[in-house]
């Protein structure tokens, strides 16, 4: 992140994206640790829930809630985490059935995960609207959250702001058209510009690494 232009720009113009990126990295890191811990617990033949694993999942659930509450970008990351979690659940279930071992722990883990990763983020997201509720003098927190979420959804889905410096979203991964944030003339011969774009060395290499990992998973994954 310290070498990426986009992170540098977004952190300097005080957007929420840097905070959202932090929580997304945190929740994914905690998920990876939790999956590894669950795999070790399962290999030990445990049949009852592991409190250590549940504690890590709860911590991760709070991180997910903070990410979603900071910016809805965290919600998309949460969906990706759900797919990853269910994929591992399915893999463990098939492995236990194949080895003729009880699947009780896998089922329990699935129920715990779905509950924690659904209720905790929703609770944190709901609580994040308390300042808004106090500012409006309202009493129904759920109504404030619902109306605020609908307002944000409608605003971003209906906004149309055409200008010559716009950057189509499909050009972002390749850095084809930098997003111009601000511009101003300084004197007669100088211009001040603020643009958002990624470091091509990192982004282009990241795209190549992404497709390499996809091929590696398909060809060499543990069957």
Question: Where are these predicted regions, by residue range?
Answer:
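Hydrophobic, aromatic-rich transmembrane alpha-helices
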Residues: 185-222
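Transmembrane alpha-helical segments
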Residues: 23-35, 79-86, 123, 206-214
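Membrane-interface transmembrane helices that cradle and orient dolichyl/undecaprenyl
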Residues: 27-56, 86-95
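Aromatic-rich transmembrane-lumenal/periplasmic boundary elements in polytopic membrane proteins
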Residues: 102-114, 121-175
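Transmembrane-embedded, aromatic-rich helix segments that form part
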Residues: 21, 59, 73-94
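Short acidic/glycine- and proline-prone juxtamembrane loop motifs at membrane-interface regions
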Residues: 12-19, 70-73
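Membrane-interface helix-loop-helix junctions at transmembrane boundaries of multi-pass membrane enzymes
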Residues: 44-51, 93-112, 208-223
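Transmembrane and membrane-interface helices of multi-pass
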Residues: 1-4
